[in-house]
């Protein structure tokens, strides 16, 4: 464990508490519940191009997105990094590139599960998401930078040691998914670790098999996992109140261990 960091479990707990305080400070629980129902129908189920920007059209929806999906995606990523032994150790400061970072939780969870100090680079087209990502990195005391353009970040960054793409590719069209695959494949072949996470439903991600098939089986594995989530009580209550899963999530994963 990095001697300058508190244990990951302690920092996770403090982060989730801070997330609750941040997004319930000026809103009622019932407001966030209604917003989460609307957000789930308007964004997660449709997942059309630009869906995030249009879906987050009010304080309640932004709070629901950052709080519920932030917590669930953080814990799911953390569980996968542990199970797949993707955490970084040793000397140096490996870079974790988080593409379509949203509120920053995937890259942050990976960094938190690493013994080595890391540098997270989060890229997202949403200004709201980047604002929340910067808060996430600061709250967890992680060295990090953010960029507004995924394409420009891919072009400018040197080969990162880790690449996280969590619940992101479904927001993009085929051409943009192809650009990402073409850019990161050489990195993976040179030893970068890769963690791609998407919903398991073929209806939600009909493009998955073709996209994942671009990566050689000798380097990458495709998995499906049902992850049990130890959500904080209020997040679990929010999920149940909105008719969403509170105990587990099912995902499909493309992973390369470097």
Specify the residue positions occupied by each region the protein language model found.
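Conserved Class I S-adenosyl-L-methionine-dependent methyltransferase catalytic core
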Residues: 30-88
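A short glycine-rich, Lys/Arg-flanked "PGG" loop and its adjoining helix->strand segment in the class I
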Residues: 178-190
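A short SAM/SAH-binding and catalytic strip from SAM-dependent methyltransferases
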Residues: 161-175
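Class I S-adenosyl-L-methionine
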Residues: 217-258
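Conserved beta-strand signature within the Rossmann-like core of class I S-adenosyl-L-methionine
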Residues: 190-199
């Amino acid at each position: 464990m990095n001697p300058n960091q508190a244990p990951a479990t302690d920092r996770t707990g403090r982060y989730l508490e801070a997330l609750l305080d941040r997004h319930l400070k000026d809103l009622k629980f019932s407001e966030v519940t209604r917003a989460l129902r609307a957000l789930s129908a308007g964004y997660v189920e449709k997942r059309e191009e630009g869906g995030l920007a249009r879906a987050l059209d009010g304080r309640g929806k932004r709070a629901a997105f950052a709080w519920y999906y932030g917590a669930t995606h953080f814990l799911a990523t953390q569980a996968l990094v542990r199970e797949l032994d993707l955490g970084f150790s040793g000397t140096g400061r490996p870079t974790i590139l988080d593409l379509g970072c949203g509120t920053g939780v995937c890259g942050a969870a990976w960094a938190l599960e690493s013994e080595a100090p890391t540098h997270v680079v989060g890229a997202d087209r949403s200004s709201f998401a980047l604002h929340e990502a910067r808060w996430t990195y600061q709250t967890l005391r992680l060295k990090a930078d953010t960029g507004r353009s995924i394409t420009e970040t891919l072009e400018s960054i040197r080969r990162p040691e880790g690449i996280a793409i969590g619940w992101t590719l479904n927001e993009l069209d085929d051409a943009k998914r192809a650009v990402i695959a073409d850019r990161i494949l050489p990195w993976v072949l040179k030893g970068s670790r890769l963690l791609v996470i998407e919903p398991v439903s073929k209806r939600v991600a009909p493009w998955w098999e073709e996209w994942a098939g671009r990566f050689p089986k000798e380097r990458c594995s495709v998995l499906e996992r049902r992850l049990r989530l130890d959500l904080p009580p209020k997040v679990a209550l929010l999920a149940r109140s909105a008719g969403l899963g509170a105990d587990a999530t099912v995902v499909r994963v493309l992973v390369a261990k470097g």
